[in-house]
Swiss-Prot record:
The lineage of its organism: Eukaryota, Rhodophyta, Bangiophyceae, Bangiales, Bangiaceae. It is found in: Plastid, Chloroplast. It comes from Pyropia yezoensis (Susabi-nori). It holds the Pfam family AAA. ATP binds at G266, I267, Q268, G269, T270, G271, K272, S273. This is Uncharacterized AAA domain-containing protein ycf46. Its main location: plastid. InterPro entries: AAA+_ATPase, AAA_domain_protein, ATPase_AAA_core, P-loop_NTPase. The gene is ycf46. Belongs to the AAA ATPase family. Highly divergent.
Amino acid sequence: MNFTQDLRLLLKSRYPIIVINTREEDRLEYIIKHSLNCSNSQQVYSWDFVDGYTNNPSDNGYAKRNPLLALEFIENLNNESLNLFLLKDFDSFLNEIVLIRKLRNLAKIIKTQSKHIIIISCKINIPFALNDIITVIDLPLPSLLEIKKEIIRLSKALNLNLNSELVNNITKSCQGLSIDRIRKVITKIIAQYNQIDSRSLPIIIEEKRQIINQTHLLEFYPYSKVNRDIGGLDVLKQWLQKRSRSFSKQSLNYGIPSPKGLLLVGIQGTGKSLTAKAIASDWMLPLLRLDMGKLFGGLVGESESKMREMINISEGLSPCILWIDEIDKAFSGLHSQGDSGTSARVFGTFITWLSEKKAPVFVVATANKIQSLPSEMLRKGRFDEIFFLDLPNRQERESIFKIHLSKVRPRSWQKYDIHELSLLCNKFSGAEIEQAIIESMHTAFSEEREFSTEDIKIAIKQFVPLAFTDKEQVESLQAWAGDGRARNASLT
């Protein structure tokens, strides 16, 4: 079911109090008044803290700055027809004991009447005492069809002649933005160019990047054709290649369900984060990076709201790649954390979404210490596959040297003895190989000459890799993967 159907069902089932999670107040009001087919006999009352009830014909502005009086108005209104009460700003007062008691009393009364309270909130933090009488649903970001209708409406209102291809491109670029933001960015484009054309697309993408980054939770990386070569990991590459068209219409028509995602487990510096970026580039999809540290930061109760916001943005932007870096740091020691169960609830919401999500969001989670993750995370159905990224073998080290040397010396990389270098750096990660090359370049540059194979050899000999400095952790991770708990990303 979509949002309108969900809301209509809740109203029909006489749910007394509904909290709708959204920042789009105007869009929600429009949906309620038009999509729900509210007739003249069905009254919609709207209240906010500053102006009170703004569409109350008998007393416009009633109950301003008084949320308790706003509830008493609902209680005392005598009307046999369906009445919907939209309460804005009300979520800021939900923890006040007088309002908690009033809402509980009111919920009993309006169950037998044609009254429904809808609280609009962008931060869900329901007091425990109200959990049994309040139902929370999310207003998703506009669908492609909704965005397209708005683009066509705006073009007609502004007397713009847009061809169908441009409309489709603008629509796709606006995916993940609210209707209000779409109107603002279109106005900005008109102010700059006096028209909408192909120059509009980068402006929309930049607007989207800024909006998503302002959440301080997600970072947005638009689709880029940048070549992101990864040395080795042939098994993982083959697995991804088979699924590169999984979000296409042809795949949907074939009956293939959208892939859920990957859990990449491995030693630091083996290419887990680079793999997430490479998937987005190869599959030609935008990339969202979730900062798990910021998910659990802030005030009590905010983590759950942030998780819902992350899900809403990801699904609104889909198809996309959601990259969750170092997920083990967020959920380690989950059952021992003394935060009144917040972490457990956020974790429960997350893994339920992983298992049940229908939107084409491909999750790429990375972990360095798999032992820290709750066992529920590793169950089948959470991710399509768990891959282990080990330290590269000799052939993979040769490939890594070739990639990095060709980046810094695209015309002369062949002069370096890659075979000899790959033999010298046994137990080096890809990141450590890159660092050895950079160190050799610093040495040669300081002496005002070109760096050589010998410089890289010296840098390798001076470098102490993680496999030695954190030997116990590396061997523990290799032993875990060796028991068949994860699929090896490389050919053995």
